[in-house]
């Protein structure tokens, strides 16, 4: 090849190199993709990574992360469902079966349950209230000789049988703190003692407790418990007094009157009294030795009863059965949401009829000649 031919060949080679280089620097894919441009469509950055890395590695990472996300979501759904289950209100027919006791009244005309042994499902109730982590309060008054005669046995038996397995606060009202006996309590129980002003007459002691309970609910009890019972001290727990008794407002059937006709009840029959209930009216006769409900409902009960007591004092009259007469008037106008059978406050002097399957709480022997002289 002559010199001219070599020059031409060299120029062609240089031109080709220049063209290739120019295409390379102006191509986003680079020289490798330019060479195979006709076989590879333009792809974005993520697709390039997928092409360069093995599929099994990329998919493995993705599935693992997705699995973790799915597990977290499932846990979240389970937690939300658990919270929803915990706050779902328990329906009456979930735990109550009135047909189990056909021989007695188990449902009122306003559809409130009357709780008798055998009518309730304890397991369902315990499971529900355990999730709620409830605290139940119990107020009791021991004035004068009631401290030495009744207080220790009442609290000791309550420690054993009242709301077992749940937090309980005993609110003990006395006129002499120095006389309160030491009582060893079980787990989940606490004891709070308050000194109250003594009254000259036992009738006034009985009636003034409505005022005192209301004051303590407002001051602290409403922030400390979910439910509250108020009981007389001259009683003894005989068996489990449990969560089947809890409700918005709870009334106790009086053992001596639960089978009587309303016209025979010892309601206050004088028109001058705020506790007046005329003949022909009334549902049941309720015992003031046991009543309860939520703190706000109990506050309303005590405040309304005390208003009636003050009105009677203003009119120089005293209801036949004092605070109990006013309590019966209250429940006539404000129907209780739950009623406890006489099994929950029984007097053994009546005997033990077939209606009474299990005595939960019983009256102590009344020694009025000893304990009512508080002057």
UniProtKB/Swiss-Prot annotation:
**According to the record, which residues are glycosylated?**
300
Q: Which family does it belong to?
A: Belongs to the glycosyltransferase 6 family.
User: What one GO molecular function would you report for this record?
Assistant: N-acetyllactosaminide 3-alpha-galactosyltransferase activity
* Entry domain remark: The conserved DXD motif is involved in cofactor binding. The manganese ion interacts with the beta-phosphate group of UDP and may also have a role in catalysis.
Pfam families the record matches:
Glyco_transf_6
| Keywords on record | Glycoprotein, Glycosyltransferase, Golgi apparatus, Manganese, Membrane, Metal-binding, Signal-anchor, Transferase, Transmembrane, Transmembrane helix
Topology relative to the membrane: Single-pass type II membrane protein
The entry's localization annotation reads: Golgi apparatus, Golgi stack membrane
Active-site residues per Swiss-Prot or TrEMBL entry: 324 (nucleophile)
Q: Which residues bind Mn(2+)?
A: 232, 234
Keyword Protein transport, does the record have it?
no
Chain positions recorded as substrate binding sites: 141-146, 232-234, 254-257, 266, 366-372
Cofactor dependence is on:
Mn(2+)
For this protein, what does the record note about how its cofactor is bound?
Binds 1 Mn(2+) ion per subunit.
User: Which species expresses this protein natively?
Assistant: Sapajus apella
Which lineage do the record's taxonomy fields give for this organism? Eukaryota, Metazoa, Chordata, Craniata, Vertebrata
The protein, known as: N-acetyllactosaminide alpha-1,3-galactosyltransferase
Coiled-coil portions = none
- GO process annotations (BP): carbohydrate metabolic process; lipid glycosylation; protein glycosylation
The transmembrane segments are: 7-27
Its GO CC terms are: Golgi cisterna; Golgi cisterna membrane; vesicle
InterPro entries, per the entry: Glyco_trans_6, Nucleotide-diphossugar_trans
Question: What this chain does, per the record?
Answer: Synthesizes the galactose-alpha(1,3)-galactose group by catalyzing the transfer of a galactose residue, with an alpha-1,3 linkage, on terminal lactosaminide (Gal-beta-1,4-GlcNAc-R) disaccharide borne by a glycoprotein or a glycolipid. Preferentially glycosylates proteins, can synthesize galactose-alpha(1,3)-galactose on glycoproteins but cannot synthesize the glycolipid called isogloboside 3 (iGb3).
Tagged with keyword Acetylation: no
Q: Which residues lie on this side of the membrane: Cytoplasmic?
A: 1-6
Q: What is its EC number?
A: 2.4.1.87
